[in-house]
Amino acid sequence: MNRAAQKRRPFGMKTYNIAALAGDGIGPEVMREAIKVLRAVEKKFAISFSITEAAVGWAGIDAAGKALPDTTLELCKKSDAILFGSVGLPDRDPTIPKEERPERAALLRIRKEFSLFANLRPVQLPKALAHSCPLSLDRQGNGIDILVVRELTGGMYFGQPKKTEDIGNGQQRAIDTMVYTTSEIERIAHVSFRAAQLR
């Protein structure tokens, strides 16, 4: 933040440190717009954001040799929040081992490192767009308002073993393991319960 911006800040205004990881593909475009939103929030409310950008995904591989550079991870640890774009490029992902690809080496690692286990995905249909919905108008009722709560750090993402093996006669067998602990199930259930109480 420059000195002029610091002078304009009201006394006692809270500043939040944000790690902005634009990543690959549409990530940089989405990140530019997200930062514009944060700047608009600063103008409207007594809040300030110190935003530091860092490489992740193929941008990280190109800059530092890995999808989640050490400097990016350290920035995330020192920040109040992480603003994440997207990672992975279909034309480049197949060129490296699965474990080193951006989704696994960057996104899943960040989720695990910071216990980012709950993804809240709202589904809403404004009445102005009702005609675009595949559901007939009589089935839409008063509109659509759904919240999907998705668990991110257990299940098949991190379950082992996970492999494909030859079993002879031109056949292969794929093994993928779904693993959840009691506490992982309880915590995602409680996020869902709390969200339901607010609806």
Regions found by a protein language model. Give the residues of each.
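Anion-binding alpha/beta catalytic cores of soluble intermediary-metabolism enzymes, centered on
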Residues: 13-25, 43, 48-50, 58-199
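Short N-terminal binding/cap micro-motifs at the start of the first secondary-structure element
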Residues: 26-31
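Alpha-helical scaffold elements adjacent to nucleotide-binding pockets in ATP/GTP-utilizing enzyme cores
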Residues: 33, 37, 106-109
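Short catalytic helix/loop segments, enriched in acidic residues and glycine
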Residues: 35-45
